[in-house]
Amino acid sequence: MLRLTRSVKNLSLGAVRFQSTQAPRQPKNMFVREAERAERDAQEAQKWRGGKKHLNFGVDMSISETPRGAAENVRVAPATALQYTGRGAHEQTMEVVNRVRRQYEFLPRNREGVSPPNFVTRITYLTMLGSSEPVSGPQHTELTKALADLYYIDNQLKPQVVKDLLRRFSRKIDTDAESGEIETLDEQGRAVTRGRRKTSSARVIVTKAPEGTVGEVRVNGLLLSQYFKELQHRSEVLFPLSVVQSEGKYNVFATVLGGGNSGKAGAISLGIARGIIVHNPLLRKRLSKAGCLTRDARTKERKKPGLRRARAAPTWVKR
């Protein structure tokens, strides 16, 4: 037993005596190995091509002309790194908008007396991008908020670059479609327009009142106060005139058919607003902002089976 122990001890000492003095070899990093492999492939390709220039990865090279090792390293790189975000088209657009914002962030903003901006909708913005990437609501809101910051720059100081950018994303509203066909004054200086509301239809003639006289409003041959007994209906008819502060400056003759007093008043009001624009097209923006040029498309909701009216239900009892 003693002899075996001494022999084992001598073996261990001998192993220590003949051990190498060099440090143990550390495993290489994965990125280092890949870099060395790419360098070897490039050297092989250079030798194979007869000492010509290095492989140009920006040129479209067919695999048949490149060694197998070098062909595996050829990758089609995207035009911008934003492509890796999954929404590259939107991020690239935001990068352009934010760059313009940073460039002109020192310019003063003016919100007083400026109409609110009207930018493209999310569906239109998706069409403008022309890509298969979806555009969510928060992404569209991000764009409109950035554009609104540029929109409120003082018009006297607004650069042409900002104007072109806003014009690209502005929604084009056809205001003539809201007011029907473009009307003109006839030989007698009258504006003949039409208006509709619910089941009522009105034909309205608007003329300027002679100087020194107060214009009047007649409905089916009767004065406005005689035809509409309620103040609410009379106020609705005269609302377009009050918006442009032209009470008493025009004579209005309306012929209205169908519906009740509420529908008739709405139809006449729309016809008056359209007639005012024929006389003075510069008032279109003010009337449109007040909602006078948009037809009210609401109608009475139909009665439902089992209900007393459209939505009113009878009292429920358990038994």
Curated annotation (Swiss-Prot):
**What coarse category fits the chief subcellular location reported for this protein?**
mitochondrion
| Ribonucleoprotein in keyword set | yes
* One Gene Ontology CC term in the entry: mitochondrial small ribosomal subunit
Magnesium is among the record's keywords: no
Which GO biological-process labels does this protein carry? translation
Q: Which InterPro entries match?
A: Ribosomal_Su5_D2-typ_SF, Ribosomal_uS9, Ribosomal_uS9_bac/plastid, Ribosomal_uS9_CS, Ribsml_uS5_D2-typ_fold_subgr
Would you tell me the protein name for this molecule?
Answer: Small ribosomal subunit protein uS9m
What is the organism lineage in this UniProt record? Answer: Eukaryota, Fungi, Dikarya, Ascomycota, Saccharomycotina
Instruction: State which gene encodes it.
Output: MRPS9
